[in-house]
Amino acid sequence: MTKHVAVLMGGWSAEREISLRSGKACADALERIGFRVTRINVDRDVAAALVAAKPDVALNLLHGRPGEDGTIQGLLEMAGVPYVGAGVLASAVSLDKEYMKLIFTAHGLPIAPYVVVRDRDWQPGPGAGPAAAAAERKRVFDAIAELGFPVFVKPARGGSSIGTSKAHNQAALIESIEAARRYDPKVIVERAVAGAEIECAVLEGLDGAPPDTSLPGQLVIEGGEEFYDFEAKYLDPSGSMQIPAPVPAAVIDEVRRLAAAAFDAVSCQGFARVDFFYTADGTILVNEINTIPGLTATSYFPKMWEATGLPLPQLLDRMIATALRKRPGSH
């Protein structure tokens, strides 16, 4: 019997356009291999759309909130619709970089030093008074100074590098924090790591087996960007990925081990992409986990799996089959 897949895409986050591109690429691929597909351009009436569609399984490709923070996952759980990917808890903690880092640290995974700047740290309420507000701002600057410049400044709960920038001094830091706060009142400031950016794709293991990992890829940026920002990811034709990453075999093995460990640390399911830094002295640092990586025609998640021997149609078929085998509530 032909399975019916609801592909959820769009939404209202800053990553809407990327989600639509991922949704189209996957819906087209699923139709080519025989699935019946309903494309749902998600708005506030998504619950009604799901009820009307009556799918066998949902493929959630919403980037950012509400698709990656556990909200849509909770809706699907309540509706009794099996779905591909991480559950409510794993989605919520993985999207919030503060809690993601706390979990990684608790599991012994290596990460770069960072500082969390909360709304009340940066902009205390009117009752605080000018002196208290200035003291709180100084505390933030002192904590960041211990990281040392340059630093990366990111919205705590965002993706596709939207709102992320690099600051080389305090004046630029203020601008970067204000820019990140336009997307999230909580901001993460990380010590900039000089090194290669490496990514590894992960799939939930079959029938309870450990996670499977792809050959890692190394990002190659030739357009002059200081880091792999939104433009480099989606708009710059000079950006590319070398698969497998041009690093020693032992590093490939360790990246794959750490990717699986990060996947398990947040209790992820389905699929994810784990990003790393690899420095000249051989240090490997986990940067973050993305529980709904891009699946556009040019995205690196499917490219890494294709290089590992699993093209997009077969990749999606496996992801759907894994979701359909889950017991209700097993997320």
Summary of predicted features, one role per range:
Residues 1-106, 118-139, 322-331:
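ATP-binding N-terminal substructure of ATP-dependent carboxylate-amine bond-forming enzymes
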Residues 39-43, 187, 191, 198-199, ...:
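A short glycine-rich, hydrophobically flanked beta-strand micro-motif that places a catalytic Asp/Glu
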